Swiss-Prot record:
It comes from Bordetella bronchiseptica (strain ATCC BAA-588 / NCTC 13252 / RB50) (Alcaligenes bronchisepticus). One of its GO terms (biological process) is division septum assembly. InterPro entries: CAP/MinC_C (IPR016098), MinC (IPR013033), MinC_C_sf (IPR036145), MinC_N (IPR007874), Septum_form_inhib_MinC_C (IPR005526). The gene is minC. The keyword Oxidoreductase does not apply. It holds the Pfam family MinC_N. PANTHER family: SEPTUM SITE-DETERMINING PROTEIN MINC (PTHR34108:SF1). Residues 128-137 have a biased composition (Low complexity). This is Probable septum site-determining protein MinC. Keywords: Cell cycle, Cell division, Septation.
Length: 292
């Protein structure tokens, strides 16, 4: 028997990563935009692998400075999509050229003119979780939620400087959205600041308050029967039909299938602290009042 063949093997794999789309090559503006996006999102996007897309800029990128800015926010770059001199500069900085499963189009940017209170900008879905835990909390919190909840994967930021899109990079083919389980994960205690709950391949139901600084994430729908004051993400692996439901909307961040909105200002009076649902309409995040 050839023992060397048992030491390793090659398998095809799918890697979920942030595609950070550059619309400007100026280092100062890039860093400022990155700082703002990460400050808005808190820990949502930390430790996500990054693929940098520089196909929309012609000016030379300062690659070492950009890589340092990403490292300062715990965003490890794993590859680059670029052309010409920028591709060579990225190679010289140690980045590996990659191909995306979705071709990159150099189309002009479209400005969304929908009302600001019910729209958002597109960002990526989340990667496969590797740890199993109920929330980022102490032992008594883990015990309370049991083994049904996985630790939520880190999330992905809006781009530098304006938009980023989640792309699936794969050696052979894109993958389909994972199937949803029929059994929802139910949390019957309030979630405090710093706690994170992730429902893998299913819906998440929280009976109680989701406090500011807490995060609730599901591959299916998210239901919060209580005040939603933290961050909520439904359709975490790309299910565009997923929705967020809450009996009292006062969220910090809302996301469905990679389209997210940071709620910096109070919502319209008809939505703020009212029953509401959040859904996708194309690439636009819609926030609507729930009426009995």
């Amino acid at each position: 028997m050839n023992t060397e063949s048992l030491a390793l093997d090659f398998k095809s794999a799918t890697l979920y990563a942030i595609r950070v789309v550059l619309h400007d090559a100026d280092t100062t503006r890039l860093r400022a935009a990155l700082d703002k996006r990460m400050a808005d999102a808190g820990s949502f996007f930390e430790n996500e692998p990054v693929v940098i897309d520089a196909t929309r800029v012609d000016a030379p990128v300062d690659w070492p400075a950009l890589l340092q800015a990403l490292a300062d926010h715990n965003l490890p770059p794993i590859g680059v999509v670029a052309e010409g001199a920028n591709l060579q500069g990225a190679r010289d900085a140690g980045l590996v050229p990659v191909e995306l499963s979705t071709p990159v189009a150099r189309a002009p940017q479209v400005i969304d003119t929908a009302p600001p209170n019910d729209v958002a900008t597109p960002v990526p879905s989340v990667p496969e979780a590797t740890a199993e835990a109920a929330a980022k909390a102490g032992p008594q919190d883990d015990e309370a939620y049991g083994e049904q909840a996985d630790e939520a994967p880190a999330h992905n930021p809006e781009s530098v400087p304006t938009r980023a899109a989640r792309e699936t990079t794969e050696a052979n083919r894109p993958t389909a959205t994972p199937p949803q389980s029929s059994s929802a994960l139910v949390i019957t205690k309030p979630l405090r600041s710093g706690q994170r709950v992730y429902a893998r391949h299913t819906d998440l139901i929280v009976i109680g308050m989701v406090s500011q600084g807490a995060e609730v994430i599901a591959d299916g729908n998210v239901h919060v029967y209580g005040p939603l004051r933290g961050k909520a993400m439904a359709g975490a692996r790309g299910d565009t039909s997923a929705r967020i439901f809450t009996t009292q909307l006062d969220a910090e961040l809302l996301a469905v299938a990679g389209v997210y909105r940071v709620v910096e200002d109070k919502l319209d009076r008809a939505l703020h602290n009212q029953p509401a649902l959040v859904r996708l309409d194309g690439d636009t995040l819609r926030i609507e009042a729930l009426k009995g």
